[in-house]
Every structure is written in structure tokens, then in C-alpha cells.
């Protein structure tokens, strides 16, 4: 069964949206195999956003991700990467449709409540970063 990495970002945690986001995931029929609330280190944030390391907004991404606790999730289900991305919505709040998590809750490009892996390969990489040394198949 396919797995993906989802993360409730610091703004989502601060605004009390964890329960709403988890409920949406579970209502879709997906199973949360693992979940942890944690304070992200600068090293983990840099590794997570490594693909953006040369971009001018990289520092802002790292600062935001380390600004408060996050909830990291290992989620399993059929076609979970693609379906969860549709549930999340577009990165830009103005482009995210109502009914998507970002369409309903995002404020800005960076304060967009949630992260979700954009491919099976990204999911494997991100799950390895966030749940180190733990098996991908539960």
C-alpha cells in the first residue's frame, strides 16, 4: 500500500487545525500509520527543503518551519500521494479551491498550513528524513 508524508506546519498547529486536518485525512479513508509532534531543527528543515537551497526564499522557508512545532504524519492508502495533494490544494492560497485544506485555511504562500509529498519518490525521501530508521511499510 502506498504511503506519503504530510506535515501540519507551524501556522496550522498554532491555529488549532490539527484535528480538522486529521479528520479530513481519515474521512478520505486513509490510515495514519505514524504521527508525532515535534520542534524542527534547522538541519532537518534545510534537508527537507534541499531542492530550494539556491533560491532566494530558502532562508525564509527554514525560519518558518523552525518557528514552532509541527505534526509529522506517515499516511497510507490507495493512491495516497496524488489524492492527498488534491485534498491539500494549490500552494498559492489565491489558487487553492474552496474545500481544499489550503483553500479553506491558508493565509500566504509560506503560511499555507500543510505540506504533502508531491510524488512517490519525494514521499520516500521525506519519510526517511522525518521518520529515520523506521520502515516504510508498516
From Swiss-Prot:
GO terms for biological process: CTP biosynthetic process; GTP biosynthetic process; UTP biosynthetic process. One of its GO terms (cellular component) is cytoplasm. It is an enzyme of class 2 (transferase). It catalyses: a 2'-deoxyribonucleoside 5'-diphosphate + ATP = a 2'-deoxyribonucleoside 5'-triphosphate + ADP; a ribonucleoside 5'-diphosphate + ATP = a ribonucleoside 5'-triphosphate + ADP. Its EC number is 2.7.4.6. Keywords: ATP-binding, Cytoplasm, Kinase, Magnesium, Metal-binding, Nucleotide metabolism, Nucleotide-binding, Phosphoprotein, Transferase. Its main location: cytoplasm. It is found in: Cytoplasm. The keyword Hydrolase does not apply. InterPro entries: NDK-like_dom, NDK-like_dom_sf, Nucleoside_diP_kinase, Nucleoside_diP_kinase_AS. It holds the Pfam family NDK. CDD domains: NDPk_I. PANTHER family: NUCLEOSIDE DIPHOSPHATE KINASE. Belongs to the NDK family. Homotetramer. This is Nucleoside diphosphate kinase. It comes from Exiguobacterium sibiricum (strain DSM 17290 / CCUG 55495 / CIP 109462 / JCM 13490 / 255-15).
Amino acid at each position: 500500500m502506498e504511503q506519503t508524508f504530510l506535515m501540519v506546519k507551524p501556522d496550522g498547529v498554532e491555529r488549532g487545525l490539527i484535528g480538522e486536518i486529521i479528520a479530513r485525512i481519515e474521512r478520505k479513508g486513509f490510515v495514519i500509520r505514524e504521527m508525532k509532534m515535534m520542534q524542527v531543527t534547522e538541519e532537518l528543515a534545510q534537508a527537507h527543503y534541499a531542492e530550494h537551497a539556491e533560491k532566494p526564499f530558502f532562508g525564509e522557508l527554514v525560519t518558518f518551519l523552525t518557528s514552532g512545532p509541527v505534526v509529522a504524519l506517515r499516511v497510507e492508502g490507495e493512491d495516497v500521494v496524488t489524492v492527498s495533494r488534491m485534498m491539500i490544494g494549490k500552494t498559492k492560497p489565491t489558487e487553492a479551491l474552496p474545500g481544499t485544506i489550503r483553500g479553506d485555511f491558508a493565509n500566504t504562500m509560506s503560511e499555507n498550513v500543510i505540506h504533502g509529498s508531491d510524488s512517490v519518490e519525494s514521499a520516500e525521501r521525506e519519510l526517511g528524513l522525518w521518520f529515520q530508521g523506521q520502515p516504510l511499510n508498516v
